[in-house]
Structure formats: C-alpha cells, structure tokens
C-alpha cells in the first residue's frame, strides 16, 4: 500500500485532500509544521499560520480519519531561514516576501526530507494546482488549478523536479 504524508493546516482543503487520498487507498499520516511561537509573541486564540488552534483542528481531523498525526517543530529553522532573511533584506531597503522563503526552505524542503525519513511515497497538500508529467520533455510540469479563481500554483513555483 502506498503511503502519503498529508500536510495539514487545520483547514478544509488539506482535510479534504486527506480524505480523498484515503479513498484512493493510500495509508495516510497527517502532519502540521510548527513554525512560529504565536503564544510567546502574545498572539492568542487567533487563526494565524501555525496557531495552536490550527494544530488542534488538524489533530481533530486526523483523529476522525483514523490516521496518525504529528507536529513537526521547525521554529528554530523558521527564525533562521525566514525571519533572519526578512530582517536582513528589510534593512537593505528591499521589499522581502517571507512567505517565499518559508515555502522554499521550510514548508516544502523540510517536509520533503521528513517524508523521505518516514519512508512515505508522496506529500499531499490542499493547494489548488496540478502536477502533470510531460512525456516529451521527461519533466513534471506545475500547472494552474482547474478553477482559475482558486489557483495556488504560484505558491509551489519553487518546487524542484524531485519534489514535484
């Protein structure tokens, strides 16, 4: 049986993705990446990236789908790979986009490595995008989601061929 690591945000999209993969016969394991200590920053009980509420929502969905669930703590990596880069760029007068670095160096790179460590076959997210294998070029292509109004392919643009 193939195994899928489900990147769970606590939202509807990743929850539905988990259910769909189970229906396709995959053995699924849910995971949420803890990137920021919201509570230490005084942000409490708000729906922000990586909040405790998000973690609990994801854990609840995983429980209902009878799948194991993990929280990967990457807060130190987030500070180094995202916040330090953001501050450095901002001090130079640039207009940094921390989400790009977070997606590239943490959300997808670290999650991909964790997937390999866990001997899983694939990572599944709730992003609206398509990955298509092009026979002519021998490459995977990242394409817009079928519903243009919900397309999130831009979030995934930094993925390598191996990650796609």
Q: Where are the regions that the model predicts?
A:
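ATP-dependent adenylation/nucleotidyltransferase module used to activate substrates
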Residues: 1-158
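Internal nucleotide-binding/catalytic subdomain
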Residues: 158-164
């Amino acid at each position: 049986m193939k195994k899928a690591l489900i990147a769970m945000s606590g939202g509807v999209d990743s929850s539905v993705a988990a259910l769909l993969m189970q229906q396709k016969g995959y053995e699924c394991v849910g995971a949420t990446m803890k990137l920021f200590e919201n509570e230490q920053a005084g942000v409490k009980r708000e729906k922000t990236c990586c909040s405790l509420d998000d973690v609990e929502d994801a854990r609840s969905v995983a429980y209902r789908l009878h799948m194991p669930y993990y929280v990967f703590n990457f807060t130190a990596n987030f500070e180094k790979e995202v916040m330090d880069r953001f501050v450095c760029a901002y001090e130079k007068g640039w207009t940094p986009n921390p989400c790009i670095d977070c997606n590239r160096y943490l959300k997808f790179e670290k999650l991909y490595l964790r997937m390999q460590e866990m001997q899983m076959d694939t990572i599944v997210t709730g992003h609206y995008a398509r990955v298509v294998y092009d026979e002519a070029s021998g490459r995977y292509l990242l394409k817009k989601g079928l519903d243009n109004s919900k397309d999130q392919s831009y979030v995934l643009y930094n993925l390598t061929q191996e990650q796609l």
